[in-house]
Design a protein with these regions (language model features):
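Charge-dense, helix-prone N-terminal extensions
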Residues: 1-113
Length: 113
Protein backbone atom coordinates (compact mmCIF):
# COMPACT_ATOMS: atom_id res chain seq x y z
CA UNK A 1 0.00 0.00 0.00
CA UNK A 2 1.54 3.28 -1.14
CA UNK A 3 1.43 6.64 0.55
CA UNK A 4 1.58 10.13 -0.91
CA UNK A 5 5.29 10.60 -0.18
CA UNK A 6 6.24 7.38 -2.00
CA UNK A 7 4.22 8.43 -5.05
CA UNK A 8 5.87 11.86 -4.94
CA UNK A 9 9.35 10.30 -4.72
CA UNK A 10 8.64 7.99 -7.66
CA UNK A 11 7.48 10.91 -9.81
CA UNK A 12 10.44 13.10 -8.87
CA UNK A 13 12.88 10.28 -9.68
CA UNK A 14 12.06 10.60 -13.38
CA UNK A 15 14.33 12.86 -15.46
CA UNK A 16 13.77 16.62 -15.44
CA UNK A 17 10.60 16.48 -13.35
CA UNK A 18 9.50 19.50 -11.37
CA UNK A 19 6.82 19.57 -8.71
CA UNK A 20 4.20 22.32 -8.83
CA UNK A 21 0.62 22.65 -7.64
CA UNK A 22 -2.39 22.17 -9.87
CA UNK A 23 -5.73 23.07 -8.32
CA UNK A 24 -4.05 23.07 -4.89
CA UNK A 25 -2.76 19.53 -5.39
CA UNK A 26 0.80 18.23 -5.88
CA UNK A 27 1.48 17.98 -9.61
CA UNK A 28 4.45 16.88 -11.66
CA UNK A 29 5.66 18.34 -14.92
CA UNK A 30 8.30 17.55 -17.49
CA UNK A 31 9.21 20.33 -19.93
CA UNK A 32 6.47 22.36 -18.19
CA UNK A 33 3.81 19.82 -19.24
CA UNK A 34 1.69 18.09 -16.64
CA UNK A 35 1.97 14.30 -16.49
CA UNK A 36 0.71 13.43 -13.00
CA UNK A 37 -1.31 14.90 -10.15
CA UNK A 38 -1.77 13.52 -6.64
CA UNK A 39 -5.15 13.87 -4.91
CA UNK A 40 -3.99 13.15 -1.34
CA UNK A 41 -7.36 13.10 0.44
CA UNK A 42 -8.75 10.55 -2.03
CA UNK A 43 -5.44 8.65 -2.28
CA UNK A 44 -5.61 9.03 -6.04
CA UNK A 45 -3.09 9.66 -8.76
CA UNK A 46 -4.16 11.16 -12.08
CA UNK A 47 -1.94 10.12 -14.96
CA UNK A 48 -1.91 10.37 -18.72
CA UNK A 49 -2.19 7.09 -20.63
CA UNK A 50 -3.10 6.16 -24.16
CA UNK A 51 -6.85 5.58 -24.48
CA UNK A 52 -6.11 1.91 -25.31
CA UNK A 53 -4.01 1.43 -22.17
CA UNK A 54 -6.65 3.20 -20.11
CA UNK A 55 -9.39 0.90 -21.42
CA UNK A 56 -7.26 -2.17 -20.71
CA UNK A 57 -6.47 -1.14 -17.12
CA UNK A 58 -10.07 -0.25 -16.32
CA UNK A 59 -11.17 -3.58 -17.81
CA UNK A 60 -8.68 -5.45 -15.62
CA UNK A 61 -9.38 -3.55 -12.38
CA UNK A 62 -12.25 -1.08 -12.27
CA UNK A 63 -11.83 -0.61 -8.52
CA UNK A 64 -8.31 0.78 -8.87
CA UNK A 65 -8.67 2.56 -12.22
CA UNK A 66 -11.23 4.90 -13.73
CA UNK A 67 -11.32 7.50 -16.48
CA UNK A 68 -11.27 11.18 -15.58
CA UNK A 69 -14.69 12.66 -16.35
CA UNK A 70 -15.36 14.35 -19.69
CA UNK A 71 -12.98 15.01 -22.55
CA UNK A 72 -9.86 14.57 -20.42
CA UNK A 73 -10.84 10.98 -19.74
CA UNK A 74 -11.55 10.39 -23.42
CA UNK A 75 -7.96 11.47 -24.10
CA UNK A 76 -6.60 8.84 -21.71
CA UNK A 77 -6.35 10.74 -18.44
CA UNK A 78 -6.85 8.10 -15.78
CA UNK A 79 -7.43 8.02 -12.04
CA UNK A 80 -5.50 5.36 -10.14
CA UNK A 81 -6.27 4.55 -6.50
CA UNK A 82 -2.63 4.55 -5.41
CA UNK A 83 -3.28 2.80 -2.11
CA UNK A 84 -4.18 -0.26 -4.23
CA UNK A 85 -0.90 -0.17 -6.21
CA UNK A 86 2.48 -1.69 -5.53
CA UNK A 87 5.50 0.56 -5.78
CA UNK A 88 6.50 -1.17 -9.02
CA UNK A 89 3.04 -0.68 -10.56
CA UNK A 90 3.02 2.98 -9.60
CA UNK A 91 6.51 3.47 -11.03
CA UNK A 92 5.45 1.85 -14.33
CA UNK A 93 2.33 4.03 -14.58
CA UNK A 94 4.24 7.23 -13.83
CA UNK A 95 6.93 6.26 -16.33
CA UNK A 96 4.29 5.57 -18.98
CA UNK A 97 2.65 8.94 -18.35
CA UNK A 98 6.04 10.67 -18.36
CA UNK A 99 6.98 9.04 -21.70
CA UNK A 100 3.76 10.30 -23.31
CA UNK A 101 4.43 13.83 -22.07
CA UNK A 102 8.20 14.33 -22.26
CA UNK A 103 9.91 15.71 -25.38
CA UNK A 104 10.71 12.88 -27.80
CA UNK A 105 14.48 13.29 -27.46
CA UNK A 106 14.32 13.09 -23.66
CA UNK A 107 11.89 10.15 -23.79
CA UNK A 108 14.24 8.32 -26.16
CA UNK A 109 17.06 8.64 -23.62
CA UNK A 110 14.94 7.03 -20.90
CA UNK A 111 13.87 4.23 -23.24
CA UNK A 112 17.55 3.35 -23.81
CA UNK A 113 18.00 2.63 -20.09
Amino acid sequence: MLDEQTVRNLALALPQVEEHTHWQRPAFRVNNKLFATIWPLQQQLVIRLSPADQTQLIGQDSITFSAVAGKWGQQGYTIAQYDNLSEEECHCLLRQSWLLTAPKRLAAQLNKK
